[in-house]
From Swiss-Prot:
UniProt keyword annotation of tRNA processing present: no
Classification via PANTHER family: THYMIDYLATE KINASE (PTHR10344), UMP-CMP KINASE 2, MITOCHONDRIAL (PTHR10344:SF4)
UniProt organism field: Verminephrobacter eiseniae (strain EF01-2)
Family per record: Belongs to the thymidylate kinase family.
GO molecular function: ATP binding; dTMP kinase activity
One GO term (biological process): dTTP biosynthetic process
Organism placement in taxonomy: Bacteria, Pseudomonadati, Pseudomonadota, Betaproteobacteria, Burkholderiales
Keywords: ATP-binding, Kinase, Nucleotide biosynthesis, Nucleotide-binding, Transferase
Protein name (database record): Thymidylate kinase
EC main group: transferase
Annotated positions binding ATP: G12, I13, D14, G15, A16, G17, K18, S19
Catalytic activity line of the entry: dTMP + ATP = dTDP + ADP
Function: Phosphorylation of dTMP to form dTDP in both de novo and salvage pathways of dTTP synthesis.
Gene3D superfamilies: P-loop containing nucleotide triphosphate hydrolases (3.40.50.300)
Cellular component terms (Gene Ontology): cytosol
Length: 226
């Protein structure tokens, strides 16, 4: 059995630019008549947003960090993601479980088996009534060299949060964690070259969705498809 909705996650290190492309894809789906739910992790519900504020500001060890993230995720799954998928929505989520394995696992060096146990507990508790676990059908991984990401963040106007303020070496480990996840799930995770200019990144995203048959190709004024 399959869910009526479609679940797409956006992943990448801080500074890769993924968040700025979520609304663009939402608009593309809406233009084709699809209902879209846009959300983020950690966050997406009143409770999860409170946990997000703690995670971004307060110092804590890797286990505490992981437990708070999975607590926020369970509430998010139950309150937002699963109801939206059951309605038939396209769910676009800025970060999901891959972030946890990349940041807390590879970045912090936290035990992957413990993360896997927490993942199973969280996802099984929020499983859809047909038994399907809430894993994205597609993950768009914005791959960018940590050094370039650091340059981009240095030019940002806002004050960096606790994760954004980590040293480049931390993000190198996180990037390797993402690469390992992509190698283990090549059909689900599509690499996006985030070093490209913005319009080329948008084209990569659209191409990935057209390839899946989820978006129609864009027709140019000359009558060709893109």
């Amino acid at each position: 059995m399959s869910r009526p909705g479609l679940f797409i996650s956006f992943e990448g290190i801080d500074g890769a630019g993924k968040s700025s492309h979520v609304e663009g894809l939402a608009a593309a789906f809406r233009a084709q008549g699809r209902r879209v739910t846009v959300s983020r992790e950690p966050g997406g519900t009143p409770l999860a947003e409170k946990l997000r504020a703690l995670l971004l500001a307060e110092r804590m060890d890797a286990l505490t960090e992981s437990l708070l993230i999975f607590a926020a995720r369970r509430d998010h799954l139950r309150q937002v993601i699963e109801p939206a998928l059951a309605r038939g929505d396209v769910v676009l989520c800025d970060r999901f479980t891959d972030s946890t394995f990349a940041y807390q696992g590879a970045g912090r060096g936290f035990d992957h088996e413990t993360l896997s146990i927490l993942e199973r507990m969280t996802n099984t508790a929020a499983a859809h009534k047909d038994g399907l676990l809430p894993e994205p059908e597609l993950t768009l991984w914005f791959d960018l060299a940590p050094e370039l990401a650091a340059e981009r963040m240095a030019g940002a106007a806002h004050r960096p949060d606790r994760f954004e303020a980590q040293p480049v070496e931390f993000f190198r480990r996180v990037a390797r964690g993402y690469a390992d996840r992509a190698a283990a799930a090549p059909r689900r995770i599509v690499r996006i070259d985030a070093a490209q200019e913005c319009h080329r990144v948008r084209q990569q995203l659209r191409d990935a969705l057209v390839c899946k048959g989820w978006l129609a190709p864009m027709v140019t004024p000359q009558g060709g498809a893109q």
